A protein has these predicted regions:
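Conserved, well-structured functional cores that handle cations and Mg-NTP chemistry
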Residues: 1-165
């Protein structure tokens, strides 16, 4: 039997689900939850980032269109907009923050965040990226850099040890 696992399924499979369950229990995130679990909320929020969803409607419609493919990941049904909004407001964000740091520690320990080079630098190695983000002058009058254009300049310093800004 041939099994095709989606890229999103592989990403969710890399998350330590047992440590997520212990974080949910420790924070009491599902204390008043009736049908929409914290895991389903995490899946919805990761989906929104990867799909570049801009609204709750985009998230819910995108998950509804993929329901047959996401049911094996622990998401029973696509959430309603009001349910997702209520969960985003009332569930503690500390659960997801600790999940990020736990996952980052797991990947650092397993060596998944890059190969160790045969040489080492004496000082910290970082890359600098500079990007211009265009903005509409009618909405952001403070962002003028030309007479007819608006924008801001973003500088990001990326560490090569853990790939975090």
């Amino acid at each position: 039997m041939v099994r095709n696992i989606s890229l999103f399924g592989q990403l969710l499979g890399a998350l330590p689900r047992n440590s997520f369950a212990s974080l949910v229990a420790r924070h009491g995130a599902e204390r008043c939850a009736k049908g929409f679990s914290t895991w389903s909320q995490l899946v919805a929020m990761l989906f929104s980032q990867l799909a570049r969803a801009e609204s709750l409607r985009d998230i819910c419609n995108g998950l509804a269109s993929c329901m047959g493919k996401l049911s094996h990941l622990g998401v029973a049904t696509s959430p309603r907009r009001s349910t997702l909004s209520y969960a985003n407001i009332h569930r503690p964000a500390a659960v997801f923050e600790e999940m990020f740091w736990t996952t980052l520690g797991t990947f650092r320990g397993a060596g998944r965040l890059g190969q160790h080079k045969p040489f080492r630098f004496r000082n910290h190695l970082a890359s600098l990226d500079s990007t211009t983000i265009s903005l509409c002058l009618s909405l952001f009058e403070w962002a003028s850099y030309r007479r007819a254009k608006g924008g801001v300049k973003l500088h990001v310093l990326l560490s090569h040890e853990d790939y975090l800004p």
